[in-house]
Regions:
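Acidic/His- and Gly-rich active-site-bordering loop/insert found
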Residues: 3-106, 111, 115-135
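Histidine/acidic-residue-rich, glycine-tolerant segments that coordinate divalent metal ions
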Residues: 65-66, 87, 95-105, 111-112, ...
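Non-cysteine beta-strand/loop elements that form the S-adenosyl-L-methionine
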Residues: 79-81, 193, 376-380
């Protein structure tokens, strides 16, 4: 009975304030600020939380665009995670076909993610105040997920250790209750140092750092055949020179290496670095490398995933309009992927302890999951099989359908928080499982 009353109050409260949440999400869409530059975006979320009675600490943990917002007091501390950084080159006018200007845009839906998490925290804090629950609601602003792994930086400087449990979500083209395994990842740059020379008159006097990069990349592409099939790596040049008639004395390439365990990722990175050392030897150059970030694989929590499923079922599927569907279908018609049909996925698969979904991607929420019991949900906000990190996502993150999905996420996360506040056994089970994590 109590859960039913909490559910109705959460729905009523969030729907009463939904226009405020939509406006902030749309504003962050327009700001479209890149990692570590989210000044307006973080301020918008901070002001929203302050308007609902949260005390906001900013900047937080050495990051100017990070924050920590708190409301309530108690030993039980329930955390929510906001993201709000955009991606380069993915600006999209709000039309269902590709029309951008080359600027940054929200091709991963973080304008929705940040506001959805903040709204969940606001709703739970309201319910706690109304029912006089002895809990603390903490909303973390975690910038720079896309490039610098902001949560990793924050975790390494002491963040998240005040939480009992942490609840996260991400807008996607389907629903998931959090039994998704992310890969460990390392971001690192390899810099080669050689000798300059005229590329035509006296190239024999030079030692080409660019040639070293080229040979390294060729070697690494041959390496792909000889690593575990679950291992991925990708690269791009960060310095390839400005003119072709100079033998470059410095060139660099940026690599990402991924694997399903932290140990396997580190072994993969070392093999890539061995190839780089070989390229330096072949070209008579020197090699150095800089690791900018590394994230572990995430620690799953079946107790929290079960809770997420139950709350999703209680909230019910989002109601997308025919106009929503037409917009999504129009976007899909301009995406060269047969499986992107523009339909909305309303199914929710019941989580099972022995059925883990392997995701080829990575997330800095994995760092949080190593500190405190954590779950990360997916919520349908746009059409099925829409390719992530593309204009087609940007075209759908400022729509009615996106708002509907975001508000549903807020309802689910707030309801999860209310049940954790009322059912101490859930917290105990989540903590026990955290001490003995599931393995693949």
């Amino acid at each position: 009975m109590e859960s039913k009353l909490n559910l109705e109050e959460i729905k009523r409260y969030l729907e009463e304030h939904q226009e405020e949440f939509y406006q902030v999400s749309d504003a962050i869409y327009e700001y479209a600020e890149l990692a570590k530059e989210e000044i307006k975006s973080s301020a918008a979320l901070e002001h929203l939380l302050e308007a609902f009675g949260f005390t906001v600490e900013r900047p937080y943990k050495e990051l100017p665009t990070a924050f920590r917002a708190v409301k309530g007091k108690g030993e039980l501390s329930i955390g929510y995670l906001c993201e709000y950084d955009a991606l380069p080159g993915l600006w999209q006018d709000p039309v269902p076909y590709q029309k951008g200007n080359g600027n940054s845009g929200h091709g991963c839906g973080h304008n929705l993610l940040g506001v959805g998490s903040a709204a969940a925290g606001i709703a739970l804090a309201h319910l706690a105040e109304k029912n006089e629950w002895n809990i603390r609601v903490v909303v973390y602003g975690t910038p720079a997920e896309e490039r610098y792994s902001g949560k990793t930086i924050m975790a390494n400087t002491g963040a998240f250790r005040d939480l009992t449990v942490c609840l996260g979500w991400h807008p996607l083209d389907h629903n998931d209750c959090g039994m998704t395994k992310f890969k460990a990842i390392s971001s690192f740059e390899i810099i080669f140092h050689g000798k300059k020379a005229h590329a035509c008159n006296c190239p024999e006097l030079g030692r080409s750092a660019l040639d070293a990069c080229e040979l390294m990349n060729v070697g690494c592409n041959y390496l792909r055949e000889h690593v575990n099939r679950d291992c991925y790596f990708h690269y791009c040049y960060t310095n390839g020179g400005e003119v072709p008639n100079i033998v470059l004395d410095q060139a660099s390439v940026w690599y990402l290496a991924r694997a399903y365990t932290f140990e396997e990722m580190k072994a993969l990175r070392e093999r890539i670095l061995d190839v780089a050392r070989g390229a330096a030897l072949m070209t008579g150059t020197q090699m150095e490398y800089r690791i900018s970030s590394e994230n572990p694989d995430n620690r799953l929590n079946f107790t929290l995933s079960k809770l997420a499923y139950e709350c999703m079922e209680e909230i019910g599927a989002p109601e997308f309009t025919e106009e929503d569907k037409n917009w999504s279908r129009e976007v899909a018609s301009h995406v060269d992927l047969p499986e992107a049909d523009g339909e909305f996925d309303n199914e929710v698969t019941k989580p099972m302890e022995d059925r883990v979904v392997k995701d080829n991607g990575s997330s800095d929420i994995s760092d949080v999951s190593q500190i405190v019991p954590t779950v990360n949900l997916y919520m349908t906000c746009y059409g099925r099989k829409t390719p992530n990190h593309s204009w087609a996502i940007s075209a759908q993150t400022k729509t009615h359908a996106a708002h509907v999905g975001m508000l549903r996420a807020a309802k689910v996360l707030a309801l999860m928080g209310s049940r954790l506040a009322c059912e101490s056994n859930l917290v105990e089970e989540a903590e026990k499982e955290f001490s003995h994590p599931l393995s693949l």
